Amino acid sequence: MAFDYKKEYKEFYMPKGTPSIVTVPKMNYIAVRGSGNPNDADGEYKQAIGLLYGIAFTIKMSKKEDHQIDGYFDYVVPPLEGFWWQDGVSGIDYARKEDFKWISVIRLPDFVTREDFDWAVRKATAKKKQDFSKVELFPYEEGLCVQCMHIGAYDDEPATVDAMHRFMEEHGYTLDITDRRMHHEIYLSDGRRVAPEKLKTVIRHPIKRA
């Protein structure tokens, strides 16, 4: 059976619907950076998702290629994630989607090296006749965070975020959003196929001791 990061690391991907504190270790991702409203039909965000999945599945299917990755094991491609911010705003202003800046990411298995990533970019570029130069290898250690499972529409996230911040303060922490520590979302549902009120999204905010 394929290794499923969501099931093997439930503390990071399947938190409860009440806030909790978690320390997230360093992970490797593939990433595309961009800006603008993620709901724009032909916008940067939609293009970024296509690029990410192109590389993610090239790496997953490398077992069928001449390029064999050392330590490879079969796995389920982890869910899409995003780091979000807006200049001049602490946190997120959901009414100003056009001002979003983001890093869209998908986690990589630890066995994927820089050489393997570079091979995947070359392979996907040749096979799909598409420019994958915006995709980068993105190692990131998130550290101490408060997180919660949000069930519902993306625009209803502020209520969950408020609950997270109250929990954080009650337990002696303060928000630590900076230019390197950002609002983080993990998308466990496909927004194209799931009703807004049933969407499952992990929301995570960086914190520090007050």
State where each predicted segment sits.
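A solvent-exposed interaction/effector surface
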Residues: 1-210
